[in-house]
Amino acid sequence: MSVIMALDVTAGNPKGLEQFASQNKDTMQAVLEAAKRHGLIAHRFYASDDGSRVMVLDEWPDRQSFESFFREQESQIRPIFEAGGVTSEPQPRFWDELQTDDKFGWGA
């Protein structure tokens, strides 16, 4: 069963992250392709409504797949976070799906 990886960081400039992404499409695509090689299932960036935080929300086959990807790509990922004004060290959290018989969406 896959896991959700949530990376929630303090960010002073989420729009800066968007700007970096639009100006560095090759870098963003290279990181995405590396993630896919490691098994990435789904990926999104989100900003909090007050603009103070950025969250990366991914689905991976397992925790080890993400950790292997992140070790390999950390030097490419760091400038993306820096562009967003990230001021805290990324601390990923991993979430396992609970069996609750009320699944909806995401291909349930």
Predicted stretch roles:
Residues 1-75, 83-108:
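Short S/T/G/P-rich N-terminal loop/turn motif that feeds into the first structured element of a domain
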